[in-house]
Amino acid sequence: MLNDTLALAQMLIARRSPTPFDNGCQEILIDRLEKMGFDIERIRCGEVDNLWARRGTEAPLICFAGHTDVVPTGPLEKWESSPFDPVTRNGRLYGRGAADMKGSIAAFITSIEAFVAEHPDHNGSIALLITSDEEGIAVDGTVRVVEVLKARNELIDYCIVGEPTSVDKLGDMIKNGRRGSLSGTLTVKGIQGHIAYPHLAKNPIHLAAPAIAELANTEWDEGNEYFPPTTWQISNINGGTGATNVIPGEVTVLFNFRFSTASTIESLKARVHGILDRHNLEYDLQWENSGKPYLTPRGDLVDAVNAAIHTVTGIEPELSTSGGTSDGRFIADICPQVVELGPRNATIHKINEYVEVSDLDQLPRIYQLTMESLLLRK
């Protein structure tokens, strides 16, 4: 299985697919999925290619989810080899997307091929959900496929997202949830004027500063057994004309919450507005919700993945909800059990990204054992 997984990963990496472009990656997958009897549904949204492929019609349905788009390469001269010319050296496969996440997608395919070959009449169903819009704004990708499935009441029982979750060893960490992400664009209004005549102006930066300090020092919640406390962070502050003798007329603050299940979108919004109002600011605040938090407690899927990892690697994985958002936040809307499991993540989005060849050897077996646990039960 290793040589096949490695070869498929190389084929996918060789397809230059900066977000939101797939550049033929999904057609490579479709060719192999059709040979296994999968029904293929291409769902194109704008420039984004999405794939929903399913084998079987019965429950339970286990889905493997991933993305074929990759982040920009950065300066090409800093790569030891071309990012889209996959090269294996010193036990590592180098190329953009090797770890995030074309290696996982290759492992999806070869694990399913092995499982179907051994168990052609298995119970339940297997699906693949692949998008080319995960690394970008993620508005025409997985979320659109989920909308299609939800509209026809096609629900998923278990989902494994192939995000590179491992840290030091393959399988040492799996994500059984993620925090939500809520962003705000705050514009505090003042009165522009000459900096030598502050009594004739209102400096919005000075007016906003106490409220910003209060927001930065607020304890939003204490978290819970699954999530750390909610955080509030400023990403950008912009005010002024660029001149040194002009008090600006307004200041704009971009901020973001990463929040746990201990808080809600509504409660966070209300508290922010309460603080701003208490400081008597004239302001405009626009919100953008990028996803609610989700959590998969211990149960069939977590137990099956844990057992598979232990069988293949001999280690006990850590359950974690740390890190950024993933497409799991969309899938959780139609699937009660979602986990993320993939190769080591030390070089994702970096120059000279790579995946350990040993991870490509073991990961398909972990996925296959998970399918056996969930689909072969009496």
Curated annotation (Swiss-Prot):
Molecular functions (GO terms): acetylornithine deacetylase activity; cobalt ion binding; succinyl-diaminopimelate desuccinylase activity; zinc ion binding
Gene3D superfamilies cross-referenced by the UniProt entry: Zn peptidases
Residue sites binding Zn(2+) 2 per the record: D100, E135, H349
Active site: D69, E134 (proton acceptor)
Cofactor: how bound: Binds 2 Zn(2+) or Co(2+) ions per subunit.
Cofactor: Zn(2+); Co(2+)
One GO BP annotation of this record: lysine biosynthetic process via diaminopimelate
Residues annotated as binding Zn(2+) 1: H67, D100, E163
Alphabetic keyword roster: Amino-acid biosynthesis, Cobalt, Diaminopimelate biosynthesis, Hydrolase, Lysine biosynthesis, Metal-binding, Zinc
Catalytic activity: N-succinyl-(2S,6S)-2,6-diaminopimelate + H2O = (2S,6S)-2,6-diaminopimelate + succinate
Pfam families per record: M20_dimer, Peptidase_M20
EC number: 3.5.1.18
InterPro entries: Bact_exopeptidase_dim_dom (IPR036264), DapE_proteobac (IPR005941), Peptidase_M20 (IPR002933), Peptidase_M20_dimer (IPR011650), Peptidase_M20A (IPR050072)
Pathway participation: Amino-acid biosynthesis; L-lysine biosynthesis via DAP pathway; LL-2,6-diaminopimelate from (S)-tetrahydrodipicolinate (succinylase route): step 3/3
Subunit-level organization: Homodimer.
Function: Catalyzes the hydrolysis of N-succinyl-L,L-diaminopimelic acid (SDAP), forming succinate and LL-2,6-diaminopimelate (DAP), an intermediate involved in the bacterial biosynthesis of lysine and meso-diaminopimelic acid, an essential component of bacterial cell walls.
Assigned protein family: Belongs to the peptidase M20A family. DapE subfamily.
UniProt protein name: Succinyl-diaminopimelate desuccinylase
Source organism: Nitrosospira multiformis (strain ATCC 25196 / NCIMB 11849 / C 71)
Lineage: Bacteria, Pseudomonadati, Pseudomonadota, Betaproteobacteria, Nitrosomonadales
Gene expressing this chain: dapE
